[in-house]
Amino acid sequence: MTAPIQDLRDAIALLQQHDNQYLETDHPVDPNAELAGVYRHIGAGGTVKRPTRIGPAMMFNNIKGYPHSRILVGMHASRQRAALLLGCEASQLALEVGKAVKKPVAPVVVPASSAPCQEQIFLADDPDFDLRTLLPAPTNTPIDAGPFFCLGLALASDPDDASLTDVTIHRLCVQGRDELSMFLAAGRHIEVFRQKAEAAGKPLPITINMGLDPAIYIGACFEAPTTPFGYNELGVAGALRQRPVELVQGVSVPEKAIARAEIVIEGELLPGVRVREDQHTNSGHAMPEFPGYCGGANPSLPVIKVKAVTMRNNAILQTLVGPGEEHTTLAGLPTEASIWNAVEAAIPGFLQNVYAHTAGGGKFLGILQVKKRQPADEGRQGQAALLALASYSELKNIILVDEDVDIFDSDDILWAMTTRMQGDVSITTIPGIRGHQLDPSQTPEYSPSIRGNGISCKTIFDCTVPWALKSHFERAPFADVDPRPFAPEYFARLEKNQGSAK
């Protein structure tokens, strides 16, 4: 399971050893919409408007207006690449990440001399300091609210108990030379910390960490109830790497930073200060969100007052394309692991695999593969679906399939839905349940059953064969042969194109 990766540069070095996993360009690119527009055609995938595809991670070495900067996009934009980076089979990601969250390895603090993230230090009280010229924060579309840091891992602690630390990825829009707006959904742990500090009239120290070991980003995307209040998600990365994540004391705020991050923004969430997200553009939009739509600009967001920026020499700014495959990987793997652990604990051996499908951005749509071994297993598929919905509240739809269906092949899933489902008996709806705030369909205008914005109808599609009819639904039994001797050049090309990620 372990891989010799401590930071983003180690991850890049690993990808460079494999075909079709990493690409660099020296062609000049504008971070304002052009970069995302380019990567849409190379590797964004996901729910990005077609045409798009899944492709390699891409480094842009020549950023217009930023001669000493480079931007990486797409590090996590492939399930196979995630498996390569975590050192496991792509089909086993849910199981392996699920093991890690149950046995976290706590982070450790190292001295500044051992922290590459502080090789360069820029203090905000310097009269020449300007976040807008220091870092090339991209926009994804021409109608974004402004430049965003899309992979800024926020790290903050409970103001009443510094031993309670949380890390999560939040939407961060550059609002001035030393200000960022921060979108914090209700109930998020850092939002709880912020509210406590604000109630006391105090700022909340925070660091924004960018350019990280992929294991850190994946672990940070776990949510309650799998990682309850007080659970430090850096422990997941520690378990995945079998080595603790290293932290370092910030240079300007009393908070820790990821020691091997490429870039760290240090600052304070100010009490009682709010800003309109699109105050400089008046676009009405924020940025592309994972469902595939441009989210609305928030009229009132908390503000981070930047105190310092630290970075490595020749630092890499890491970003993603909002609704792309990268979001599916980052959000989806913790979703899958949470479902796996919950169902396996309640019905051991029944769930064979789980996939948080790209169409749902890793959050809305879960495909559960189950295996009925005896008559008593009939009905347990519904129990598994309910457990999944309970373990991950942001799920909207569950599709249940048998063990002979490839859950990573949408054609196979639709085949099961077409030939093994009858709408009048195979669909269970659960209306009136709180959904994810970014689902644009959960409004009273969309459905008369919805009493208020944010309420959704959860749906279970049972595409499994009833136990009593199993013998009538066996797939055509083709001969099991090795085709490679018949077309060696074709299979050599195929294996080369697939790389060594699987």
What residue spans do the PLM features occupy?
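Extended, highly charged
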Residues: 1-303, 307-502
